[in-house]
Amino acid sequence: MIDRYKHQQLRIGSVSPQQISAWATKIIPNGEIVGEVTKPYTFHYKTNKPEKDGLFCERIFGPIKSGICACGNYRVIGDEKEDPKFCEQCGVEFVGSRIRRYQMGYIKLTCPVTHVWYLKRLPSYIANLLDKPLKELESLVYCDFSFARPITKKPTFLRLRGSFEYEIQSWKYSIPLFFTTQGFDIFRNREISTGAGAIREQLADLDLRIIIENSLVEWKLLGEEGPTGNEWEDRKIVRRKDFLVRRMELAKHFIRTNIEPEWMVLCLLPVLPPELRPIIQIEGGKLMSSDINELYRRVIYRNNTLTDLLTTSRSTPGELVMCQEKLVQEAVDTLLDNGIRGQPMKDGHNKVYKSFSDVIEGKEGRFRETLLGKRVDYSGRSVIVVGPSLSLHRCGLPREIAIELFQTFVIRGLIRQHLASNIGVAKSQIRENKPIVWEILQEVMQGHPVLLNRAPTLHRLGIQSFQPILVEGRTICLHPLVCKGFNADFDGDQMAVHVPLSLEAQAEARLLMFSHMNLLSPAIGDPISVPTQDMLIGLYVLTSATRRGICANRYNPCNRKNYQNERIYETNYKYMKEPFFCNSYDAIGAYWQKRINLDSPLWLRWQLDQRVSASREVPIEVHYESFGTYHEIYAHYLIVRSVKKETFCVYIRTTVGHISFYREIEEAIQGFSQACSYDT
């Protein structure tokens, strides 16, 4: 079992047969070594007790009931005075039943079996290390052809000498079928190699450091050649160079992690603890079993059959032995990854068996559902909605979630301020929603950041810290600019909220994980807090009204307001006078008073611009007043001049949307300039 206080991380990789054996085997007082599962049985149909040396054997995996052996004897767990620790009759250890959650067993395979993840998954690690085509290796693994063994200075049946480069495509026609089982086994071990055993031999002969050196030399030679002028040849060279890079990286990984390449071929097959593949009794006395149990039974059946062919029977043809080895390989493939080689295995009800890969991968797999996504204390979950008024480093927490997350802190605050005499009184005040509770909650939240996480957490920006504030409703409010880091949008996505408790976690949340400190992508360094989706649509709607200019909006009947089922008559059309405003505050105030719309054209007084006064543009209209002043109206601005043609002021034609957008940009630039001046 993994001790969370001793082990800070978990790594998944290949292990040696010796390590698998060490995990599973144990020695009972009579000197017998147990751990190997040899029988494909589960429970006896009469006694409902686990079969000895079966998939649920109590000697191998521990007792079903704590301190009770298979005979029914009881011993106190942890009492050193109670001897012995094993039952002398059945050999079951007197320990807690929880051991069945982590105690493993193993199946000793009669023939080596290639791990299908390393063979069939792309990229194929075995094909990369051996530098051979995947189809050729598959044919070798599934006994479609064989290699000649290197035998020197000895007479051979096939008269073959040399290395593995000589391949016999049709071994069944090259080898006479008059060999007996023992004779064929001796002949094969001496002169030919096929199946996963051939792969294991080649992997064992590899020198990873030589692979790195040779691959690097070949990569440099290909780089020095340059383009050939033939597009097809150039593509082959590029693909070869990419392959060599992957091969070197793979070899370095094996060296760095102390993994031997031949461990990708299994000699011992681990058996999962029984509690991870249970058999449950339902109504009516029927049993429901995990699919993995059936797949394990299939492996054991075929492995035992192969053992019988090689040990007991002497007249079995060698071809039958080959076929049985292939069946063992296919059974292990189905156990590890059902359907990876084509048609998946199904039960009697035409339902696909769930293999080991199906159990651990995906959203409902062991890692994402049970380990990474399990429920923990001081956490909550809700739908996210946009909070446009929030700062980048703030998030809005619903009152219902906030009072649950910070309940212990609020109780401590009530007791410290002598507002509650004990925990029970404090909880009753929280249930009654007294005003003092929300005041203390506000104080607590000011000093406590929270972590927001959206699954799947594929990179470090998938979980960030925020300063929480209380909001109404039952949804979490989030600034739209932080959505890209979470890969979230506001179409029903949910996010989890966690409270960091320790001082170390709070310091990490404040110094490293705040959203306004993670503005760049950790992968490529590009800005990640950029407007997307809803924000772009909002900016378009906010600023799209005046693009057509005064001519299109004022003189084109098609652009006038047209209500449903209402015809436009030129004679009845009445032009709505566009209002004038001295500053942006008056314009925005008129919008909030609903005197104008967000996209209503208006004239806003603006500072004099040298480009306007020097422009040679011809005005569209000129309005003269009784005092002698006149207005020159252009497409997007208006100039008020005196009789002497002096410029009094300039008005620009805009909308409230444009004004709001301009003010936000102006405030952001001013804030950035002030920050830069403080730094200098």
Curated annotation (Swiss-Prot):
Binding site for Mg(2+): D489, D491, D493
EC class name: transferase
Gene Ontology terms: cellular component: chloroplast; DNA-directed RNA polymerase complex; mitochondrion
One of the GO biological process terms: DNA-templated transcription
Textual note on the cofactor: Binds 1 Mg(2+) ion per subunit. Binds 1 Zn(2+) ion per subunit.
GO molecular function term, any single one: DNA-directed RNA polymerase activity
Subcellular location field: Plastid, Chloroplast
Keyword NADP carried by entry: no
Record-linked Pfam families: RNA_pol_Rpb1_1, RNA_pol_Rpb1_2
The enzyme's E.C. designation: 2.7.7.6
Binding residues annotated for Zn(2+), in chain numbering: C69, C71, C87, C90
KW Plastid (keyword) present: yes
Disulphide-bridged cysteine pairs: none
Recorded catalytic activity of this chain's protein: RNA(n) + a ribonucleoside 5'-triphosphate = RNA(n+1) + diphosphate
Keywords recorded for this protein, A-Z: Chloroplast, DNA-directed RNA polymerase, Magnesium, Metal-binding, Nucleotidyltransferase, Plastid, Transcription, Transferase, Zinc
Cofactor(s) required for function per UniProt: Mg(2+); Zn(2+)
Coiled-coil region: none
Transmembrane regions listed in the UniProt entry: none
Family: Belongs to the RNA polymerase beta' chain family. RpoC1 subfamily.
PANTHER family: DNA-DIRECTED RNA POLYMERASE, DNA-DIRECTED RNA POLYMERASE SUBUNIT BETA
Function of the molecule: DNA-dependent RNA polymerase catalyzes the transcription of DNA into RNA using the four ribonucleoside triphosphates as substrates.
Quaternary organization: In plastids the minimal PEP RNA polymerase catalytic core is composed of four subunits: alpha, beta, beta', and beta''. When a (nuclear-encoded) sigma factor is associated with the core the holoenzyme is formed, which can initiate transcription.
Protein name in the entry: DNA-directed RNA polymerase subunit beta'
Species of origin: Aethionema grandiflorum (Persian stone-cress)
Gene: rpoC1
